[in-house]
Regions:
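Positively charged, polar, low-complexity stretches
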Residues: 2-86
Length: 86
């Protein structure tokens, strides 16, 4: 794994709330290797967003703002849905 992906993995595992650490860290472990450079940029942008907002978006409790409503967010929402029932 290259340095950029390792940094993203670390950030995803240490977001601030336990729930986001689990969802985003798990997503990163499962998908970082397959993401394109553009998708990595979008994922990094999501990691910069306020933690409570991210949780509400990926769980579907709040609508995702248009600037964050992209393929990576869809992947995260799907991952979260699949893993929240386990």
């Amino acid at each position: 794994m290259d340095i950029a992906r390792k940094r993203l993995l670390f950030r995803a595992r240490h977001m601030g709330t336990n729930e986001n650490d689990i969802f985003f860290g798990g997503f990163a472990e499962a998908h970082l290797a397959e993401l394109t450079e553009e998708q990595l940029d979008r994922f990094q942008t999501l990691l910069d967003v306020n933690d409570p907002d991210l949780f509400l978006w990926v769980t579907g409790a709040k609508p995702v703002p248009i600037q964050y409503d992209h393929d990576v967010m869809a992947m995260l929402k799907s991952f979260t849905l699949d893993h929240s029932h386990k």
